[in-house]
């Protein structure tokens, strides 16, 4: 099978993008998708995105994590999908598109893509962390010395542990640098590793 694809990245979060308006891509084949995402034996990426037709907007974004399973909203992936739709000449400078969490609008201005996210209606605060859903679930925890923090081991433990268990969550570790500056490192579910950035976190 020959598949045309493009590779995009948003602040280091990288994706394979495929025009699937003809519905030929085997999107139910999780093994195949995970093989394409594999960095050693495939193309290599944090996630795979299919651009499909939508009956209610300019296009539909279907996002798959590197494990091959369909994922929740990916903010950087959404910006890359808008850039891909622009490349395909499907949109002008403003677009409305469909994603897993509903409708989104985006604007392209001076080659920068501005994406409107959904408002966060609820933030749950606990002793050592907070939890919120921005279109994807996020466990947010303040830490010290973020540079040496073991994001992989601790992130994996939180992602797989209670109360998230099998469903899992993204895990953000945050260090406050100054009054209005923060550093963030993220363990992403589905990728099951730290990524260079996370658009929803």
Model feature map: region roles:
Residues 104, 118, 129, 138-139:
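Histidine (H) residue identity feature
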Residues 132:
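Short glycine/Trp-rich loop-beta-loop segment that forms part of the substrate-binding cleft
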Residues 115-128, 153-156:
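Active-site glycine-rich loop that binds ribose-phosphate moieties when present
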Residues 1-110, 140-200:
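A glycine-rich beta-to-alpha transition motif near the start of alpha/beta enzyme domains, typified by
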């Amino acid at each position: 099978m020959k598949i045309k694809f493009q590779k995009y990245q948003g602040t280091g979060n990288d994706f394979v993008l495929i025009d699937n308006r003809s519905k030929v891509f085997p999107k139910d084949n999780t093994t195949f998708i995970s093989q394409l995402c594999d960095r050693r034996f495939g193309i290599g990426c944090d996630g795979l995105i299919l651009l499909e037709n939508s009956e209610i907007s300019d296009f539909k974004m279907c996002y798959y994590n590197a494990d091959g399973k369909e994922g929740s909203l990916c903010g950087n992936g959404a910006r890359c999908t808008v850039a891909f739709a622009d490349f395909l000449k499907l949109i002008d400078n403003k677009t409305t598109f469909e994603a897993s969490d509903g409708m989104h609008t985006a604007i392209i201005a001076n080659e920068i893509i501005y994406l409107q996210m959904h408002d966060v209606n609820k933030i749950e605060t606990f002793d050592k962390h907070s939890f919120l859903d921005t279109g994807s679930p996020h466990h947010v925890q303040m830490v010290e010395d973020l540079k040496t923090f073991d994001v992989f081991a601790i992130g994996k433990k939180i992602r797989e542990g209670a109360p998230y268990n099998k469903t899992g969550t993204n895990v953000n570790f945050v260090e406050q640098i100054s009054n209005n500056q923060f550093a963030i490192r993220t363990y992403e579910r589905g990728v099951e590793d730290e990524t260079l950035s996370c658009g929803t976190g």
